[in-house]
Regions:
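Conserved class I S-adenosyl-L-methionine
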Residues: 1-41
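Class I SAM-dependent methyltransferase SAM/SAH-binding core
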Residues: 48, 53-91
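Short catalytic micro-motifs in class I SAM-dependent methyltransferases
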Residues: 106-110
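A short glycine-rich, Lys/Arg-flanked "PGG" loop and its adjoining helix->strand segment in the class I
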Residues: 117-129
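Conserved beta-strand signature within the Rossmann-like core of class I S-adenosyl-L-methionine
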Residues: 130-137
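Acceptor-substrate binding/catalytic loop of class I
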Residues: 147-163
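A C-terminal cap/extension of S-adenosyl-L-methionine-dependent methyltransferases
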Residues: 176-222
Length: 222
């Protein structure tokens, strides 16, 4: 599956920013994700962006890693003074406690459960004590409600709060969690999406946040 992921994102690299985030749908998600990261990370900390892609969220890290050479090439053009490398998240070769924090967006939705467990352990080794790991995964509750089933590896993974706690309990403590895209963005007319966003942000922090499309988890290393 790794080769499929690599090839998929290599093929998308040139048009990725434009097609995924250069429209009102992508902007909607980008605003929500940035809002959450800003709450927890300082841009001058020694942070690692795992699966950094074209560098969309690299303003919060000095280091980035991605499996796609073509995505990394674009990230380097956008952030020439940052340490960005091609690599596999399951084979991170950094010293223990090298980073203050780490984060990863739009990666875990593609992986299998056994890979998640391995990654949580690996990241716990390279992040210092009390450091944060911020990540997003599709909401299992939302998909159960909408009866959504992915037809390929892309975005297939999903998880709920109890499962997340179980597979991270050995190395991480859950600090908080937030929703992303509570409302089905594709059903909201483009002209009014920016007006719906504040209400969406509110719902993503409410008692109903687990019903959002994705959940962003804030973990602290034990």
């Amino acid at each position: 599956m790794k080769n499929q992921i690599l090839q998929y994102y290599d093929n998308l690299a040139i048009e990725y920013d434009k097609n995924r985030f250069g429209n009102s749908y992508g902007e909607y998600i980008n605003i929500q994700e940035n809002r959450i990261i800003k709450k927890y990370l300082k841009t001058n900390d020694k942070n690692l962006d795992i699966a950094c892609g074209t560098g969309r969220l690299l303003n919060y890290a000095n280091y980035g890693i991605d499996i796609s050479p073509k995505m990394v090439a674009i990230a380097k053009q956008k952030h020439p003074y940052k340490n960005i490398v091609v690599g596999d998240i399951e084979e991170l070769n950094y010293e223990n406690s090298f980073f203050r924090n780490a984060y990863s967006f739009h990666l875990f939705m593609h992986l299998e459960l056994h890979q998640l467990k391995k990654i949580f352990k690996k990241v716990s080794e390279i992040v210092e004590k009390d450091g944060l790991f911020i990540l997003d995964i599709p909401s299992k509750k939302r998909r159960k409600l909408t009866k959504y089933k992915a037809d390929s590896w892309h975005g297939r993974n999903q998880i709920n709060l109890a499962e997340l706690k179980e597979i991270t309990a050995e190395h991480w403590k859950l600090v908080s969690y937030y929703g992303v895209a509570f409302f089905p963005i594709h059903l909201i007319p483009k002209k009014i999406r920016k007006f719906v966003l504040p209400l969406d942000n509110l719902m993503c922090r409410s008692i109903f946040k687990e019903m959002s499309s994705h959940i962003v988890y804030i973990l602290k290393k034990k």
